[in-house]
Regions:
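Bacterial N-terminal signal peptides
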Residues: 1-7
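Sec/Tat signal peptide C-region and signal peptidase I cleavage site
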Residues: 9-13
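C-terminal and late-domain segments of enzyme folds
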Residues: 14-61, 72-81, 87-90, 101, ...
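Short internal beta-strands
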Residues: 66-70
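Functional beta-strand-loop-alpha-helix junction segments that form "active/interaction loops"
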Residues: 72, 79-82, 90-118
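Catalytic-core regions built around general acid/base machinery
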Residues: 116, 120, 147-162
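Catalytic nucleophile loop
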Residues: 128-131, 154-179
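Glycine/threonine-rich flexible loop motifs
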Residues: 134-148
Length: 438
């Protein structure tokens, strides 16, 4: 009987493996053959790595790259001039598609239905969306019923047959199925939440629906607002790309970081909110920081550090021979500040201390009276580890699976008081002797 049960179990396990393999094969067959270049914004036109990568993915020298100025306001066509130069210096034959809300002599809705213009984009091997307001891109490329226009269908054809779709800032936000549309600062999102059709809206969905895209992520502390949107829409994973940095995604799965800084990977698949709290809270978020050269499989979420880090220092806080560089407690008064979260993650994985605290609040609101804020508690777990190298000329970390709990707090106000000269303080404060005699 035991042998029979074992045989049945083994057969079931084998069937499950075969079924999973077949499902993966079907997904691979249906997946677009092209690549995405998701740029966090503020890219430098003289840094060749990004532009060389876009052109290479579009087919190399002579690649036809269609540039969409749609997100820009003011002078969208003029804005594209430096971009055209950067791509053409890298070998492309790029052109600007006149789908814009100003500076062109035709209506946007007319342009996206123009057969000649649509065919020119369809024949391209790459598409590039510039920055601005992502709502302008979506409003142009979806019709009144929120269905794909002929122009968007042509863009999808470029992607499916092996071309590249690149976008910076607003052009990065549209990559996911859900995007921020016109969002206030991160602290305001933490306090007030998000509503579909207002702060968040439909993106164009080039990336898998389980992934949310955030841009200008580290410089502007936007990882916090991304967590609110992800939790609201039940999106388990997020990609936060920093400025002058890109995540290159091939065939929708294999992704590599290029550029100046890094990418934050947000995982709320096991996170829970406190149902007793009206304010936003989340427990057991996982954060990983990927630096230039690091790769991640978006399907399995397996991370491969850059070769320079694999050949240098591995940091395993749970190993018996763990010898961290830092030995101090960490408290960040503005965790939403410029690159604060990336700095914290690097120092926490390489520290004798196993947790760190960050606060998010408005100093202006708290100057005179109490105000609402949030505590971010970062802590290592059994799965936390990292790598370190100085090969790039600085302190570069790759950090995996730092845990995070967010909970609302009350900041006592006034936040501070001015000190008085000692003589004035003595005059205003009765001496102990005087108090006793009275």
């Amino acid at each position: 009987m035991c042998l029979l049960m074992l045989s049945v179990s083994a057969a079931q396990a084998a069937d499950a493996v075969i079924a999973e393999s077949a499902r993966t094969a079907m997904e691979d067959a249906d997946a677009p053959k092209g690549s995405l270049v998701i740029i966090g914004g503020s890219e430098r036109f003289r840094d060749r790595e990004l532009w060389d990568t876009v052109v290479e993915l579009a087919g190399g020298d002579g690649a036809k790259i269609a540039i969409f100025p749609t997100a820009s306001s003011g002078q969208p066509i003029k804005t594209c001039a430096k971009l055209v130069q950067a791509l053409n210096r890298a070998g492309a034959d790029s052109f600007v598609v006149p789908v814009a809300w100003s500076e062109v002599d035709r209506d946007v809705q007319e342009a996206v239905f123009d057969p000649e213009l649509v065919e020119r984009v369809r024949a391209a091997t790459g598409v590039y969306f510039i920055g601005g307001a992502q709502g302008r891109i979506v409003d142009a490329l979806l019709d009144d019923d929120r269905e794909q226009t002929p122009m968007l269908k042509a863009i999808w054809e470029v992607y499916r047959r092996g071309g590249v779709i690149a976008g910076t800032s607003a052009g990065a936000a549209i990559m996911s199925h859900v995007m921020f549309r016109d969002a206030p600062p991160p602290l305001q999102i933490l306090r007030n939440g998000v509503t579909m059709g207002e702060e968040i809206d439909d993106g164009l969905g080039f990336l898998d629906k389980n992934w949310f895209v955030e841009q200008h992520c580290l410089v502007r502390g936007r990882f916090a607002r991304a967590l609110v949107a992800m939790h609201s829409q039940k999106i388990p994973f997020g990609i936060g790309v920093d400025e002058n940095t890109a995540l290159v995604v091939r065939r929708g799965v294999e992704a590599t970081v290029i550029g100046y800084k890094g990418v934050l990977i947000l995982d709320i698949s096991q996170a829970k909110a406190d149902s007793k709290m009206d304010e936003f809270s989340l427990k057991n978020v996982k954060l990983s920081y990927l630096d230039r050269g690091d790769s991640i499989n978006l399907r399995t979420r397996e991370v491969t550090p850059a070769e320079e880090k694999r050949d240098d220092i591995k940091l395993d806080p749970n190993a018996s021979d763990f010898s961290p560089y830092f030995n101090h407690r960490m408290f960040y008064t503005d965790i939403l500040g410029n690159a604060a979260v990336a700095d914290l993650l690097g120092r926490l994985i390489d520290n004798k201390e196993s947790e760190a605290i960050g606060l998010a609040f408005s100093g202006l609101d708290s100057k005179h009276e109490p105000s609402d804020g949030f505590e971010f508690r970062f802590y290592r777990g059994p799965d936390s580890k990292g790598w370190y190298t100085e090969d790039y000329g600085g302190e570069d970390y790759t950090v995996l699976d730092i845990h995070l709990d967010i909970r609302p707090i009350r900041i006592n106000g006034p936040l501070y008081e001015h000190r008085m000269p000692a003589e004035e303080a003595r005059r205003e404060t009765p001496s102990e002797a005087t108090e006793l005699t009275e």
